[in-house]
Structures are given as structure tokens and as C-alpha cells.
Amino acid sequence: MTLLALKEDRPTPKAVYNWRVYTCAAIASFASCMIGYDSSFIGTTLALPSFTKEFDFASYTPGALALLQSNIVSVYQAGAFFGSLFAFATSYFLGRRRSLIAFSVVFIIGAAIMLAADGQRRGVDPIIAGRVLAGIGVGGASNMVPIYISELAPPAVRGRLVGIYELGWQIGGLVGFWINYGVNTTMAPTRSQWLIPFAVQLIPAGLLFLGSFWIPESPRWLFANGRREEAIKVLCWIRNLEPTDRYIVEEISYIDADLQRYAREVGKGFWKPFLSLKQPKVRWRFFLGGMLFLWQNGSGINAINYYSPTVFRSIGITGTNTGFLTTGIFGVVKMVLTIIWLLWLVDLVGRRRILFVGATGGSLCMWFIGAYIKIAGPGTTKTEEAKLTSGGIAAIFFFYLWTAFYTPSWNGTPWVINSEMFDQNTRSLGQASAAANNWFWNFIISRFTPQMFIKMEYGVYFFFASLMLLSVVFIYFFIPETKSIPLEAMDRLFAIKSVHNANKILMDELNFDRNPEREQSSLDEKDRVTQTENAV
């Protein structure tokens, strides 16, 4: 099997895997670049000497400073929580593409407001207000982009294409982690030093805004809203095939059948998906989607993203530049491993297996780091020149090993699964629920991490390690493998009782249904058996 080999649900023309579908996914993923950047730059910006001096952090007690920092960080997640819910309404009435335009505008306004902050008159209030609006923008985009990409993607590369969204997140995060190292080493600690990281937010948001005028609307949304001719035209353009091609005819028939079935079972309309929550199978999938983000945030990733200087200081890394450098390396490792996940792991190894490995290995690393901090107490050292012990070096190694386990597993896979497992009539609501869950748990972590490090110290790492172990049990019993399964067959996948064998069972069913020669051979065999029995 080659690196980029694909497992197809049916014979697929090579033209389907064309530049158009990848370009649309890449443009939509500018949204994740702005999410990744905003998630990573804020922690190190709050540690910049110019920022701490401008807003007089030295005058705060440790508890008061932790509260201020957590408020600056967490209002973004609070806004994102509500933005992800607003996206359900905009998705229904405006569609996927125009929703992306709207949320990029909201983000741009929020980012511009942040630039008005200063230490003399306005204080940090513009930053807090702007981060609420920016949060609404990224919350809506985090809902919309995985849906949009999954509805454009051929099944064999759906994980890879939704993974571009995760790659964009890591690229934005990489820039966010390194930008403060750059301004801290090359610029004097003036107001301009900390304004630059805030201003850079406007770049990915502007690219998303402009790019959204070029990408087409989701053909599935167009079909669902009665714009059939436009939907077929868009589908043919994305697939690079003629309307009469067998692949296009089959895909249209699958979409039609799915829409007709749900029109009967659920009905059409803005409120109808809410009525579908009466069905246990729908509620169950909403629960699964939300729990995936609980376990993702329970790994500790966002404690590191938002408060990396605090995290590295607890291990024993002191000095502003040293902390920024270590954080930047963390961003590089994450991006490289995301590319590996995107090109190989997610669609070849599958979703379940990498979640198992990531949670198990990551948990072991967290146990080691916590034990080291408990025994050595490196975070108690106050001097900037403190040297790392061999145990401290080992702890840093295990931190990066944790990154190697977490990134190609839990970082993007929950988004992929949530983009796949809901049917057409509940997909927007389901993704809104999943994104809201992500931002809710994100808010909890970002709001309380500074206080957790003050109160729990090494226990923070034991806490995250325990949650990662619990996620292994959850995945084994409740999450089926979704790779290569058409969106229209997800109901059948989640109806199969044998969770660990569900993917194989369904793929065998799909291959049998689409192989008339095999079916005819089976019928001929039955006829021969019947004739033999009659002869006897």
C-alpha cells in the first residue's frame, strides 16, 4: 500500500480527485488558520515584557493576575460557544458559503477593536470586547468549515480534506507560537511590539473573506433547498465530470434518496431537526459528538495552547525567550505530525485506531511529567538562570512525546468524525452541537487553567492523564470506524451493534450491493443448488 493509497466505497474516476475540491477545502480552511492563530498567540502575548509593562501586570497579586489573564483568554471561547450555535441558523438560511463570509466579517471587526487597547485610557477592555466578537466569528467558522468540506469531499478522501482544516489550524498556531519569539528578540519592548501579534489576526480573516466569494455553495445544501439545477452544475464542476457520468448519476441518486428518506422521517424546515432529537439514535450521536470534544480538551491541549509559558515554567523552563522558543518548537512538531496524520493516518489507519494509540501513549507521558514535578519541584525555582536537571530534560522529552501521540490522533480526528456522522437533516444542528461542545470545554479549560496550576501543581498533569485513559474505554465501546463510509450510509453504520466490526460489516454490504456480477453469481449458485436438490 502506497502512502497516498485510497480506500474507495465504489469505483471512482480519477478526475474526481482534482485540484478544485482541494482548493475549495484550502480556502475554507483559512478559517482554521485564524482559529489556530488566535488560540496560540494570546498566551505568549500576555507574557511579552511590553504587554506586561503596558498594562502594569506587576501591580497584581498572583491570584488577581491569574483571574485577569483567564478572563482575557476565556471570553474568546465564550464568544465561540455562541457563534457555533448562531451558525446553525445562518447555515440553514444563508448556506455554507455566505455564512463563512458573515463570520469572517464579525471576526475582522473584533480583531480591529482589539487594536484600540492601551495602558493609559482604555486598558484591556477593547481586547476583551474584541475577543468576544472574534470568538463569535471563529465559533461560527468552526461549525461551518467541516460541514462544507465534508459535503464537497469524495468519501475516499473525506478525512484527508477535512484534515486540511486541521492543517490550517496548525499553520495558524505555528505562526502564533513563533511570532512573539520573533518580536521579543528583534524589537524593543514598546507598544508596537505587542500590537503586531494582534494585527496579524486580520490576515487569515481577510483571506477567508475574499476567498469565500470564489468557492461554490455546497451542492448538498443546494439540493436540500430545491436549487437542483445549480446543485448539479456545482457537483459536476467539483467532480470535474459530465452530468451523464455514472459517478455523478449515482451520487445524485444517493443524495436524493437520503433527502427523501429524511423528508419522510424528520421533515424539512428550520425547526424539524430539533424534533428529530426525539429519536434516541439522533440523541445518541449528539452525545457521542459532544463527548469526543470533552476527551479532546481533557487531554490538556488547550491548557498548553493558551498558557504555554505557565506550562513550561512548571517543568522548569525559565526565561521569556527560552519559554517562547520551547513553545515555537511545540508548534513545529504539531504541524509536522498533522501533515503525517493528514496524508496517511486518518484515511488509511482509520479514526478509531489512532484515537486508541494517541490517548494511551499521551496518558503515559502525562503521568511521567506529573511524577517528575512532584519529586523535583522545578517550578519553584525563581531565578532566570536555573539549569535543567537530567530529570527536567526527560520531562521535556516526554512533553514532546506527548505531542507526538496527541497531535496525529485527538487534535483533528474528533472534527472529522463529527463532520461525517450526522445525516443531511441534522448535520448543521449536529455540527453546531459538536462545535458548541468543543468551545464549552475549551472555555472551562482556558478559564480555570491558571488557578489549577496554582492550586494543584503536579496534579494538573495527573488529572489530564486520567481523562486520556478514560477516553480509551469510551472509544472502544461507543465509536465505530467511519473511514470510507458514504455520508448517506452513516445511519446504517451506527445501527450496527458490533461497534468494533461495524465498518467492515457495512463495507462488505456496500461492496456486495454495488457488484452485480457477484450478486448474479450468488443467484446462479442458488439456482444450481435448487436444481440439484430437485434432481435428487
Curated annotation (Swiss-Prot):
Residues 48-74, 120-131, 182-195, 307-327, 374-389, 457-458 are extracellular. Gene3D superfamilies: MFS general substrate transporter like domains. GO terms for molecular function: carbohydrate:proton symporter activity. Residues 516-536 are annotated as: Disordered. It is a multi-pass membrane protein. It comes from the Eukaryota. Residues 1-26, 96-98, 153-160, 217-285, 350-352, 411-435, 480-536 are cytoplasmic. Pfam families: Sugar_tr. Residues 516-530 have a biased composition (Basic and acidic residues). The chain crosses the membrane at residues 27-47, 75-95, 99-119, 132-152, 161-181, 196-216, 286-306, 328-349, 353-373, 390-410, 436-456, 459-479. Glycans are attached at N184. GO terms for biological process: quinate metabolic process. Its main location: membrane. The keyword Cytoplasm does not apply. It is found in: Membrane. Keywords: Glycoprotein, Membrane, Quinate metabolism, Transmembrane, Transmembrane helix, Transport. GO terms for cellular component: membrane. Belongs to the major facilitator superfamily. Sugar transporter (TC 2.A.1.1) family. This is Quinate permease.
